[in-house]
Amino acid sequence: MTVARVNINPDVLMWAIEYSQRGLEAFSEKFPKLTKWLEKSERPTVKQLEDMAKFAYVPFGYLMLSEKPDIPIRKISDFRTLQNQGFIASDEYSAALRDTINIVRSRQEWLIDYKKDKDYAPVAFIGSIDRNMSDDDIVNHINKVLEIPTNWRTKISSRANALRFFVDILESKGIVIFINGVVGNDTHRPLSVSEFRGFALADKMAPVIFINGADAIAARIFTLFHEVVHLFLGQDGLDDRTEPFCNRIAAKLLVPEDLFDKGWQKYAHDFEQLEKFFKVSQLVLFRAALTYNKIDEKEYARLVKLYESTHKRISMTGSGGDFYNVAPYRVGRGFCRYVNEAINSGALTYTEAYNLLGVKGKTFAEVMKKAKEG
């Protein structure tokens, strides 16, 4: 039986190799006949081309094109990086980060159109602060809008519960939150905490926060508030002033100065004891101590370096854990509710919903059920 072979453009294959960022050597090892395909001395089979598409993280149809596809990298200029190492140029994004951005932007764009079509009101607080306001006024404004109980620290038993508590509040205010440690639902493609911890996409109709679920739970809480400040600014851009500003305000929201002063009087420099009370990581407390002039930049850097070298990150939404428990956070619980609403109103087909969430059939039904349960 003759095996069907496919005519391909070698330039398209090279584009896929470059797009994947895996490198030519990895492809040559995976596909021993790659050189012959590139030289056009032999043609790949349909199965071989399908396997290559999967390996390159591109749709199979792209490899059948006569010309290289023009796929722009959808840039984001705000990333909370590990110790805020700075701006990441779009041409430096890893394939995993690039694909994550595309997934999140696609979901946001759908939600913007859906909410406009259904006459949803904009989220009023997006862009409601600016850096000319005093820190106290900003903190008071954000607390008033979000309605976070002042006694939350005494009511919540763990940092994992604290994260869920804050996600619930933010989702109730119209912010869509995704927490994921992998690309989509592909557990073979983990996200790197050293590359980014989170990002925000400011839009009055559908503000979005993405948190890298590969990070430690306590670190995610600070990232969440850091990105909240970006949304209140109404921007997802980064400059030399914005990141320190967002860090400072996030620290003040999580660790108010009056409470920190009381804790410091009792446990000065004992960050383990402070951590137990504030329900936030020592990294956040280091930031608060710096913000409130209890330590200087040099001591802050030393503490962070020591902490990072001795604490392992634990992921709830990475490759581990029960899929049905983590999936609602990966695809966004609040986002799932909009999708369910759209299906019930006839504005979205099940096939379209499957594509939006990256799950289908019984898996889709179970994920939607878990998202509804919260």
Tell me what each language-model feature is.
Residues M1-G374:
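Active-site hotspot residues in diverse enzymes, especially metal/ion-binding acidic/histidine motifs
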